[in-house]
Amino acid sequence: MNIEVEMKVLDERMADVVPVYATKGSAGLDLRACLDEEVVLQPGETFLVPTGLAIYLADPSYAAVLLPRSGLGHKHGIVLGNLVGLIDSDYQGELKVSLWNRSSEPFTVKPFERIAQMVIVPIVQARFKRVEEFVGSSRGEGGFGSTGLH
């Protein structure tokens, strides 16, 4: 499935590094830090990184999800400050990435470094129907850990 997404380059330095799929099977597109200079994230610190780009999905049956890059998280403890970013179809502002250094070492974010990935996902908008009781299920109200460890 392919959709067309409108993209604005808000900072001309990003014109040559717009998001592209790295391989035919890639699900995510890398977003880069649109910075004038390096930013050092101290342990436990968060920083809102501009990307210099804006997108407009327009179609409410799609959204964009921002996710951490696996290498940054695993090797350096750098994840998203909000864990997952959600870009609604009607948002038209600059894409910004909240980076969080959850490691015990400072981490330097360099200008134009790949900092997150963006995945376009289908959305279902639910209509809720109020009921007094649910039809029974085998799980019922069993929650946290109720299905066992393995």
UniProtKB/Swiss-Prot annotation:
Its cofactor is Mg(2+). It catalyses: dUTP + H2O = dUMP + diphosphate + H(+). Keywords: Hydrolase, Magnesium, Metal-binding, Nucleotide metabolism. Pathway: Pyrimidine metabolism; dUMP biosynthesis; dUMP from dCTP (dUTP route): step 2/2. GO terms for molecular function: dUTP diphosphatase activity; magnesium ion binding. Its EC number is 3.6.1.23. Substrate binds at residues 69-71, 82, 86-88, 96. GO terms for biological process: dUMP biosynthetic process; dUTP catabolic process. The keyword Magnesium applies. Coiled coil: none annotated. This enzyme is involved in nucleotide metabolism: it produces dUMP, the immediate precursor of thymidine nucleotides and it decreases the intracellular concentration of dUTP so that uracil cannot be incorporated into DNA. Belongs to the dUTPase family. This is Deoxyuridine 5'-triphosphate nucleotidohydrolase. The gene is dut.
